């Protein structure tokens, strides 16, 4: 069995890890970094840039540089959270035919899983470059509070990237695996507080250690899938925009280039204020009016930032209370608090969490890497490389169906350990009813329409009977990824209908296959582009070398020979401007053949120079020899 890699597909940054022997290892990407910005850019030349290269060009290409796509994955366009993002994102979020939130990039409609797949492809290539082998399987993490649609969309992204997603696991659970794997013996109850770039989760996890076999059991989970570092950045950006407007009377919101510069500066300032009390946001030539260029220079203190985001930090505290209550525990029952996600580096976040739990969070867990490490551990468990670890995760939200009167009747309650299966018998609501519609819901509200609709299907062919007579058995089956399978069966006729919830918001099989094919085609195009660049570099180096040799030896080359070499140089230079790899290779070979005499002369000259240097150094050695006269002294004893 090949390696199963662990991927933390984050809102702001992503990370990939593997099991190296019995130890997890976080891998460095092609830029030499252990985390990769979850940023994808589509350039004018048709290139797709991922990570740091995409981030670097964001200022000049804001509308086609996509970030925080995880906030849109598995979501409907009409969702309140999406409507909020439309107002602040520089790129265009549109309504797709099935009601999903999609993105318009250069007049091409793209689904969030298709865009996220580009980040996963980079993670896959990072692992392949390190291992020197093809990678086909992965464990991918998601926020614990992701619903069925968001989990399914994440699996779709994996498939589009050419990965078989062996398991979807919750981010806090993965962090607990990373934390608990090398800890000493003994049972512990931990709280994992995960505040990332776009999502927030809290999980209460019990680690049982019996005869060196560790069981990680999630007791409860809660969270907010639209709360994270991006929201903190937005608050600071808004403040800077308002301050600049007060000073200069210009609203920067109308300038996408200025807003992209401001976004980068705000993120940098926020990070600096985790260690400094004050920082300057200094952006010269941010914009201009009829009076000339304008510069932005605003001082921001840590206390100012804290006042801007305090309500966001407090929004994370309520889920902590709910999770503890659901787990049947009090604050005193928690042995350790683990902080995960880059936003937890903010001192205010750390102090509020410490105040709530009455203890300082642990500092020995890397908040940026723990989730990927845990995913790699789970990959090791699935491949058999890691023994004595059992993971018992939960479903974050209740699952049920709509029943008479528009009520949601739960079949599986939130925080139920998965995989799980539950059946319940329902009956018809009207006389002689020949069909029933099973409307599947996810959420905690009593009124059906207040919950997330996951999909619906019909069970036809029910024998006519008085109301309440027919018996319809509905079964909910959740697999290890938290994906739901539903069946409905007429107990009298044995007629059955099944559905795997693909979510009412989601990609159909045809769309996924098309995106997989597109990704494979792009992969081939990427490979060809890389080869073209390598050949161009070879050509450039050869031109530089031959020109240098010509300058040094032009008096020793016949005029006719010289013209041939210059013509071949011009031909190669011309082809380097084009896209034809085979033509460049042909011209490289042609120049090598024509300039062979020049190369011989140059080599001969180099050899002669070396001989001269050797002779010169020998004579210098001789100069340093001191002549001395020796007198033989005879030993009188002999």
Curated annotation (Swiss-Prot):
Skewed-composition ranges (Basic and acidic residues): 602-624
Keyword Nucleus in annotation: no
UniProt induction comment: By stress conditions e.g. heat shock.
InterPro entries assigned: ATPase_NBD, Chaperone_DnaK, Heat_shock_70_CS, HSP70_C_sf, HSP70_peptide-bd_sf, Hsp_70_fam
GO molecular function, one term: ATP-dependent protein folding chaperone
Modified residues (Phosphothreonine): 199
Record key words, sorted: ATP-binding, Chaperone, Nucleotide-binding, Phosphoprotein, Stress response
Chain spans, region Disordered: 600-638
Protein task: Acts as a chaperone.
Alphabetized PANTHER family for the sequence: HEAT SHOCK PROTEIN 70KDA (PTHR19375)
Similarity comment text for this entry: Belongs to the heat shock protein 70 family.
UniProt name for this protein: Chaperone protein DnaK
Source organism of this protein record: Buchnera aphidicola subsp. Schizaphis graminum (strain Sg)
